[in-house]
C-alpha cells in the first residue's frame, strides 16, 4: 500500500481569512493528502487581529485535519503605505526563520502567492534544502502589483524590483496562473513554457 502524500502549503493568508487557498487545502485533504500550512496571523484586510489572535499567537492550530504553523507578521494597521510595506516584508522574513518548526516529510511545496512576491521565499528555501518540487500559484504579478500600491518612480529601484521578482518566479518547478493573460505574462518574464 503506497504511503500517504504530504504537502507543505506556504501562504501568508489562511483561515479565518477568506481566501481561495482554504478551498484548495480542503481539496487536498479530501483527496487523502496530508497537509501542513505555514501561514500568518490573521489580520487581513483591516490590519486588525481577528478575535482570538494577537502578536502572541496562537502559533499552532489544527483546521479540518490540516496542521497550521503560524508566523509573526507586522499587521497592515490602517493600510498606510508604511504598514503595508512592513507587512509585505515581515511575514516572509519570519516564515523563512520558522522553517525549523515544521515536522518535515513533505513530498512537495505549494505556495499560494498573493502579494508580495517575496511570500514565496520561504517555500523556495524549504524546497531547495529538502530537494522537493515547488509549485508557485501566482495571483498577482510583481513588481506591477507593487506599483499599484506604492508610487515607485526611481528607475534603479524599479529595475531591482523587476530582477528580484523574475528571479523568484524562475525558482518554481511549476507555475500556476490565475488567468490566461497572467500565464502569458509569466511565460514571457521567466522564459518558462506554458505547460510549466
Language-model segments: what does each one mean?
Residues 18, 85-96, 108-145:
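An aromatic- and histidine-rich active-site surface loop
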Residues 35, 134, 194-195:
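Hydrophobic anchor at the start of a short beta-strand
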Residues 176-177, 183-196:
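Helix-loop-beta element that forms the nucleotide-linked donor phosphate-binding surface
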Amino acid at each position: 500500500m503506497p504511503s500517504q502524500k504530504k504537502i507543505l502549503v506556504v501562504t501568508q493568508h489562511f483561515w479565518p481569512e477568506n481566501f481561495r487557498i482554504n478551498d484548495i487545502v480542503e481539496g487536498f485533504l479530501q483527496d487523502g493528502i496530508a497537509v501542513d500550512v505555514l501561514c500568518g496571523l490573521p489580520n487581513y484586510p483591516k490590519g486588525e487581529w481577528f478575535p482570538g489572535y494577537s502578536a502572541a499567537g496562537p502559533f499552532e492550530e489544527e483546521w479540518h485535519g490540516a496542521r497550521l504553523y503560524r508566523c509573526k507578521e507586522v499587521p497592515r494597521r490602517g493600510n498606510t503605505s508604511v504598514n503595508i510595506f512592513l507587512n509585505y516584508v515581515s511575514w516572509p522574513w519570519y516564515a523563512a526563520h520558522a522553517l525549523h518548526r515544521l515536522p518535515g516529510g513533505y513530498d512537495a511545496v505549494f505556495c499560494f502567492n498573493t502579494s508580495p512576491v517575496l511570500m514565496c521565499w520561504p517555500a523556495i528555501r524549504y524546497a531547495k534544502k529538502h530537494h522537493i518540487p515547488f509549485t508557485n500559484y501566482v495571483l498577482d504579478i510583481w513588481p506591477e502589483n507593487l506599483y499599484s500600491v506604492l508610487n515607485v518612480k526611481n528607475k534603479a529601484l524599479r529595475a531591482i524590483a523587476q530582477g528580484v521578482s523574475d528571479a523568484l518566479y524562475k525558482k518554481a518547478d511549476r507555475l500556476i496562473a490565475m488567468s490566461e493573460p497572467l500565464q502569458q505574462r509569466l511565460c514571457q518574464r521567466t522564459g518558462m513554457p506554458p505547460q510549466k
